[in-house]
Design a protein with these regions (language model features):
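Surface-exposed strand-loop-strand hairpins of Gram-negative outer-membrane beta-barrel proteins
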Residues: 59-88, 119, 188
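Bacterial Sec-dependent N-terminal signal peptides
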Residues: 1-26
């Protein structure tokens, strides 16, 4: 029974480690790093395995535009859609201090490309890119209940998200046949958000039977900084309208994720099916919410598979979007108030995200 629970929880938390709120497109929910260290007590009490390393690969392609929940199908039909390709390599090292406490550090490496017409001359499609270290996160975790005495448990975590990613990354924009300007790339492919943030996590599991368990994860990033000063003019001059509504510089938004689901384990193989909600809210909990942001959320069904090789777990999880919603931003609301005409911007979303990786103990 203990071994089954151990495999189940390892499979559950591998993805909690590596899938902390990440974008599926222009809603710029980027990798914030992080591993939660929830393993079963039989592994936690093994003093010979105090270290844990997780490597996660994440990829998505976003190209379907939404205003609210309404898809703008004409964007794909007329070839004006924005296409983002996003790859993240998350490297996370965890130290188990004892059966109660653990600490971790995560370093995401990002490689992004963005293809569009409107950012350039409006007629031809060009690419902008970004590559480098993202925002590093350090965290501490503790079990609520004694891991040795329960078939379910709750783990809480607090962390610090550092502004290590370049939030003013630049590339060239083609304005016409003879003019190319250098400017900050779109917010959705910036390597960081420029703010120091604070994270809180709750991770839980409960074994329903020898083979079936339930899990849940909650993650929230608090970003006190309101704006990071990065221009949204792509190397040009900000318009009077963008300055008036505050969208001329990039915002530093909060973000959160909620996951819940069930797992079925047979020997070393675990199959899971869950629900996932990723959100970049309109308003932050702390600090202001002005500046340019594309708020919204993605609701996904999340199937997954994990296989245990004693000290190594390999896994694949593929959240598939079932609802995408680009909500009205603060800048949209200000413009609506100033003009009397309802304004709500769009955002491009992916159909699915691929997460593949492994965790090993030593």
């Amino acid at each position: 029974m203990k071994q089954c629970i151990s495999i189940l929880i390892s499979g559950i938390m591998i993805v909690a480690f590596s899938c902390k709120v990440n974008a599926q497109g222009c809603v710029a929910i980027r990798s914030t790093g992080g591993i939660c260290t929830m393993d079963h007590h039989s592994e936690q009490m093994d003093t010979a395995q105090k270290w844990e390393f997780n490597l996660n690969n994440r990829y998505f392609k976003s190209f379907r535009h939404f205003v609210g929940t309404k898809q703008q199908k004409q964007r794909v039909e007329n070839g004006s859609e924005v296409i983002n390709h996003s790859y993240t390599l998350d490297l996370t090292l965890t130290r188990h201090l004892n059966k109660w406490w653990s600490v971790s550090v995560d370093a995401p490496i990002l490689a992004n490309s963005r293809s569009s017409l409107y950012e350039h001359d409006g007629k031809n499609r060009f690419l902008t890119h970004s590559f480098g270290l993202g925002d590093v996160r350090v965290s501490a975790y503790r079990w609520i209940f004694d891991p040795a005495k329960s078939k379910g448990n709750i783990q809480v975590g607090l962390g610090l998200k550092l502004a290590t990613g370049d939030y003013k990354y630049q590339d060239f924009f083609h304005k016409n046949d003879s003019t190319v300007v250098l400017g900050p790339v779109d917010q959705s492919i910036q390597l960081g958000d420029g703010g120091t943030g604070f994270t809180t996590e709750i991770n839980a599991f409960y074994s329903l039977s020898q083979s079936v368990s339930a899990y849940g994860n909650f993650y929230y990033l608090v970003s006190p900084r309101e704006q990071n000063g990065t221009s949204t003019a792509r190397g040009g001059t900000s318009s009077a309208t963008s300055i008036k509504i505050g969208s001329n510089v990039m915002s530093v938004p909060d973000q959160y994720m909620i996951r819940a689901g069930v797992n079925y384990t047979e020997k070393n193989l675990t199959l899971s099916l869950g629900f996932r909600d990723e959100c970049l809210p309109v308003h932050d909990l702390v600090g202001g919410s002005k500046g340019f942001r594309r708020p919204g959320f993605i609701l996904s069904a999340e199937p997954g598979i994990t296989y245990n090789f004693k000290k190594i777990n390999i896994y694949a999880y593929v959240p598939v979007a079932i609802e995408r919603n680009r909500t009205q931003s603060v800048a949209d609301k200000i413009q609506t108030k100033l003009t009397g005409v309802y304004t709500q911007g769009d955002a491009a979303f992916a159909d699915y995200t691929v997460n593949v990786g492994f965790t090993t103990k030593f």
